[in-house]
Amino acid sequence: MQLNPAEISELIKSRIEGLGVSANIRNEGTVVSVTDGIVRVHGLSDAMQGEMLEFPPTADGTPSFGLALNLERDSVGAVILGEYEHISEGDTVKCTGRILEVPVGPELIGRVVNALGQPIDGKGPINAKMTDVIEKVAPGVIARKSVDQPMQTGLKSIDSMVPIGRGQRELIIGDRQTGKTAVAIDAIINQKGQNMTCVYVAIGQKASSIKNVVRALEQAGAMDYTIVVAASASESAAMQYVSAYSGCTMGEYFRDRGEDALIVYDDLSKQAVAYRQVSLLLRRPPGREAYPGDVFYLHSRLLERAARVNADYVEAFTKGEVKGKTGSLTALPIIETQAGDVSAFVPTNVISITDGQIFLETNLFNAGIRPAINAGISVSRVGSSAQTKVIKGLSGGIRTDLAQYRELAAFAQFASDLDEATRKQLDRGARVTELLKQAQYSPLPISLMGATLFAVNKGFMDDLEIKKVLPFEHGLHQFLKSSHAALLDKIEKAKALDKDAEAELTAAITSFKKSFA
């Protein structure tokens, strides 16, 4: 059989034309150096700030990614997200053209994930239908709505003196071991049945502490509406830095669809330290306390994303699917101070960004006053307009009483003969202080909190011994639950006290007090 050269060339040509090879043009670079999770790459001329870079996979085939953070004249400085031991000089790095994205949606509820949204709770894969970028522009002024709906924490001292509204940013600040996490966890537990999705972001915490928090949430049934994002102390600084933005994106999913969400950042001091570590390794110039110049922007761009958005924004975002509903993302950032120094760099930054702060004091905590809230310097700038009517009406004098009591108590130590008015004020202050104590993981509903505040306002506790104040409150709650359940339901639904309810409550407390020994 003789082969014709013309036929052969035609055959080859047709084969080449029929070959379906897609050209994939991607910018590639070479690893120049790897140190402490920071990689310097040469040749990525088209890399964007914050772009994901693709590195060679690990030994078991897991893909490796990094974030381009430093764009220099002849190289790119990137941080590796995860393991970096397998990366060496000369490896090929590719641009992806994408910003870092994490899975979002209701599929994440009840799960514990890492900073990249990957499950770490051993409950199998998360089949999320959507992903979203971790860095987003916060809603503008026109898209926002004023904060006027309460976000009840269930803690008497906070809901009465430092009320928080949906869409507010309220800082929880204090030294280590003053109960900051406990306040935030109580707030999450109290959202049961309130149509609120919660996100708890643990940054730089011990793995055992995160496990304890997850266990507490499971026991309270709070994991049914909570997502836990964990970047423990053993993870890289890059993962700790990214985790807060990942959690925020997961919370924004619900806000943008006309739902309410609560996010706790525990804590932003450790995130700032992680960012400082990354910045110094990238050879960025250090500023005050060795933090980089953009550490304020680090927190402001995160916390500005917590907001209450109006119905027009939600309707436009969902393309008309959700109408007439506002959405909110409430943030409770936590900051750890050193020896009560709130004038340090990161605490002052976050205080100026947020809408108020709850200041927890070591002295109060050690004296058994828990939550250890300092009423004098704790403030909520927008929460009072969101406070429920019943609590607002009954808590007016409590803050003033407490602040004056602390002031008078300091002077009373040196004075032996006090006038009657001062003695009365000291007695009342001591009872209010005792009454605001609350056990951990036991938030109160509005009706029972209202009953407690009503009893103290009307002087039912003025003649009780201080050590009997909390037993009286506990007994009163049990009595009202068993004998006056309808009244509690009425207060819970109306969130206000009318004259009939007030008269019934007075009669109930009087009746209980007679039987209280």
Curated annotation (Swiss-Prot):
**Keyword Iron applies:** no
Q: Name the membrane topology term.
A: Peripheral membrane protein
Catalysis: reaction(s)? ATP + H2O + 4 H(+)(in) = ADP + phosphate + 5 H(+)(out)
Signal peptide segment: none
What Gene3D superfamilies does the record point to?
Answer: 2.40.30.20, ATP synthase alpha/beta chain, C-terminal domain (1.20.150.20), P-loop containing nucleotide triphosphate hydrolases (3.40.50.300)
Q: Where is it localised?
A: Cell inner membrane
Q: Which domain of life is it from?
A: Bacteria
Would you name any one GO CC term? plasma membrane
InterPro entries from the UniProt entry: ATP_synth_asu-like_sf, ATP_synth_asu_C, ATP_synth_asu_C_sf, ATP_synth_F1_a_nt-bd_dom, ATP_synth_F1_asu, ATPase_a/bsu_AS, ATPase_F1/V1/A1_a/bsu_N, ATPase_F1/V1/A1_a/bsu_N_sf
User: Where does the UniProt entry say this protein principally localizes?
Assistant: membrane
User: What GO MF terms are annotated?
Assistant: ADP binding; ATP binding; proton-transporting ATP synthase activity, rotational mechanism
Keywords, ordered alphabetically? ATP synthesis, ATP-binding, Cell inner membrane, Cell membrane, CF(1), Hydrogen ion transport, Ion transport, Membrane, Nucleotide-binding, Translocase, Transport
The entry marks the following residues as binding ATP, namely G174, D175, R176, Q177, T178, G179, K180, T181
Name the job this protein performs.
Produces ATP from ADP in the presence of a proton gradient across the membrane. The alpha chain is a regulatory subunit.
* NCBIfam families documented for this protein: atpA, PRK13343.1
Subunit structure and binding partners? F-type ATPases have 2 components, CF(1) - the catalytic core - and CF(0) - the membrane proton channel. CF(1) has five subunits: alpha(3), beta(3), gamma(1), delta(1), epsilon(1). CF(0) has three main subunits: a(1), b(2) and c(9-12). The alpha and beta chains form an alternating ring which encloses part of the gamma chain. CF(1) is attached to CF(0) by a central stalk formed by the gamma and epsilon chains, while a peripheral stalk is formed by the delta and b chains.
Q: Which HAMAP family match?
A: ATP_synth_alpha_bact
**What family is reported?**
Belongs to the ATPase alpha/beta chains family.
The protein's name is: ATP synthase subunit alpha
Q: Which organism is it from?
A: Variovorax paradoxus (strain S110)
Which gene is transcribed and translated to give this protein?
A: atpA
